């Protein structure tokens, strides 16, 4: 069923004279030969993506022209499909919700206070709704990363690549040669009570370096890193950095490097840890090195590096195949397929995907679901084999995540 080009709410926005905030920056990007435009909030670092039709409206917002005039002008001059009134209303709401829009109307004090109140209670509300996955912002690392990003810029050139290969490649051969020793009775080694204490101390440090890798790469290509904090996944502290501004980087290969920077950092750490593990006698240093290898190796191969899970590998794949929001679009595509062909809903609206995109979406979503289920159940059974109660708690908690 086609959507009406007219909106019952048009009267509330038609007379507004909007313009973008001064800290909003527009960039042109190309995905699969089709132009898109990103609007980056330089104050907060977030990036929003819009179609060509939406961009033509946004670019014409000068603070003097009414929304109705902008819409009429777009419909009278556009050779392509212009935005409908409901789409314009949605666009204005999205820009307003992101604090990117300024209008000629005086601010509503009550509405502003209500918005601040909702924002203040947003984090506690998320904690109450999902106590197994808490996110606590701690500080703004942008100034720190800006100060040191220039000193580390060589890491993203030939010298950095050569150093990484010189350290990692020999370590890979040594790992193969010592594989039996490294993996002997692995689960008992990892889940022993003494090793778990060491792992709890090592894990946050390794993951902090992982996240700083993303942050330095983002700063190297002109992005902003406005937030560093702790995310408690099933009560385990995991550092994170907010690098959504990297999605405004025009080159898809540079965006992919930003997504891969954390894994490259961990692999480098794992290689150094292997050398330490081979050189020192059994003791604290060897235990720490072993845990660095386990954390970096397992997380890279099984979790972060796999595009079927929504971690680093996922963003690398989405950037390289030029399908942003791959998971969400895959879910929308499969919802359409099930509605249209499974339940015979002939009025189901087909998502606006090309033939090549629909092939990726058709394959990706079921593969991701199967792999995610396999990894989740495998981890639960592995932990439950050593600590039954913890395994049960993990299984129950995943129902809520």
Put a short name on every predicted segment.
Residues 2-9, 32-36, 42-155:
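Long, charge-rich, low-complexity alpha-helical segments
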Residues 158-165, 258-267, 360-372:
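Select subsegments of transmembrane alpha-helices in polytopic membrane proteins
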Residues 271-286, 370-392:
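Transmembrane helix-loop junctions at the membrane interface of multipass transporters and ion channels
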Residues 191-357:
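Membrane-embedded catalytic scaffold of the fatty acid hydroxylase/desaturase
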Residues 103-164, 224, 231-232, 313, ...:
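Membrane-interface and transmembrane segments of multi-pass membrane proteins
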Residues 122-228, 272-277, 283-286, 294:
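Core alpha-helical transmembrane segments of integral membrane proteins
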Residues 1-26:
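Eukaryotic partner-binding/assembly regions in large regulatory complexes
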Residues 399-401:
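Conserved small/polar residues in nucleotide/adenosyl-binding loops
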């Amino acid at each position: 069923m086609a959507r009406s080009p007219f909106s019952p709410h048009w009267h509330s926005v038609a007379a507004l004279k909007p313009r973008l905030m001064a800290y909003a920056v527009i960039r042109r990007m190309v995905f699969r030969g089709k132009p898109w435009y990103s609007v980056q909030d330089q104050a907060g670092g977030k990036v929003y993506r819009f179609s060509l039709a939406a961009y033509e409206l946004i670019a014409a917002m000068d603070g003097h022209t009414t929304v109705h005039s902008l819409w009429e002008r777009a419909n009278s001059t556009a050779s392509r499909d212009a935005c409908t009134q409901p789409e314009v209303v949605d666009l204005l709401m999205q820009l307003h919700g992101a604090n990117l829009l300024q209008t000629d109307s005086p601010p509503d004090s009550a509405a502003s206070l209500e918005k601040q109140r909702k924002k203040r209670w947003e984090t506690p509300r998320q904690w109450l709704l999902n106590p197994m996955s808490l996110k606590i912002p701690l500080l703004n690392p942008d100034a720190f990363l800006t100060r040191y990003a220039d000193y580390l810029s060589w890491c993203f050139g030939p010298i950095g690549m050569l150093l990484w290969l010189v350290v990692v490649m020999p370590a890979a051969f040594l790992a193969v040669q010592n594989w039996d020793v490294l993996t002997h009775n692995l689960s008992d080694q990892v889940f022993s009570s003494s090793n778990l204490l060491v792992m709890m101390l090592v894990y946050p440090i390794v993951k902090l370096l992982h996240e700083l890798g993303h942050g330095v790469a983002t700063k190297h290509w002109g992005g902003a890193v406005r937030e560093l904090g702790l995310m408690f996944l099933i009560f385990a502290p995991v550092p994170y950095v907010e690098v959504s501004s990297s999605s405004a980087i025009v080159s898809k290969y540079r965006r992919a490097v930003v997504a891969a920077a954390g894994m490259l950092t961990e692999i480098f750490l794992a290689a150094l840890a292997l050398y330490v593990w081979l050189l020192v006698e059994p003791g604290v240093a060897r235990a720490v090195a072993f845990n660095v290898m386990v954390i970096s190796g397992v997380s890279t191969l099984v979790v972060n590096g796999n595009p079927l899970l929504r971690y680093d590998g996922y963003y690398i794949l989405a950037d390289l195949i030029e399908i942003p929001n791959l998971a969400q679009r895959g879910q929308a595509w499969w919802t359409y397929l099930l509605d249209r062909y499974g339940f015979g809903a002939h009025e189901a609206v087909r998502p606006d995907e090309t033939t090549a995109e629909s092939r990726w979406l058709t394959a990706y979503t079921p593969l991701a679901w199967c792999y995610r289920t396999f990894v989740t159940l495998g981890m639960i059974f592995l932990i439950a084999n050593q600590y039954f109660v913890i395994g049960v708690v993990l299984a129950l908690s995943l129902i809520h995540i």
